[in-house]
């Protein structure tokens, strides 16, 4: 049974311009486990992100957390792009600083 991922993008701490923070992309509920998750800054892939170990829930759906350090400001736009067999094209979810 294939299941599409749920994608949530949020900062670890409330966003303040110029103050270092962590950007998280939490992807959950997907199956099969093969998935590609990228954090983007202004549409460009951020290198050197960290990824948790693949974990699964009791119902055998999987979840992953990808995160990186970042410093929010009003100029840059951040998002998370996910590629999975259930998605016809990559899903991109923007970070909303008020989330």
Swiss-Prot record:
UniProt keyword Disulfide bond, yes or no: yes
Tree of life domain: Eukaryota
Compartments where found: Secreted
Matches recorded under CDD domains: IgC1_beta2m
SUPFAM superfamilies according to UniProt: Immunoglobulin (SSF48726)
Annotated GO CC locations: extracellular region; MHC class I protein complex
Entry keyword set: Disulfide bond, Immunity, Immunoglobulin domain, MHC I, Secreted
Keyword Disulfide bond part of the UniProt annotation: yes
InterPro entries: B2Microglobulin, Ig-like_dom, Ig-like_dom_sf, Ig-like_fold, Ig/MHC_CS, Ig_C1-set, MHC/Immunoglobulin
Descriptive protein name: Beta-2-microglobulin
Organism taxonomic ancestry: Eukaryota, Metazoa, Chordata, Craniata, Vertebrata
């Amino acid at each position: 049974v294939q299941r599409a991922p749920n994608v949530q993008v949020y900062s670890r701490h409330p966003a303040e311009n110029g103050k270092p923070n962590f950007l998280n992309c939490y992807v959950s509920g997907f199956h099969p486990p093969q998935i590609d998750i990228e954090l983007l800054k202004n549409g460009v892939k951020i290198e050197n992100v960290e990824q948790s170990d693949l974990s699964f829930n009791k119902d055998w759906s999987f979840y992953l957390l990808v995160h990186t350090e970042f410093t929010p400001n009003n100029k840059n736009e951040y998002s998370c792009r996910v590629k999975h067999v259930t998605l016809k094209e990559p899903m991109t979810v923007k970070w909303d600083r008020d989330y």
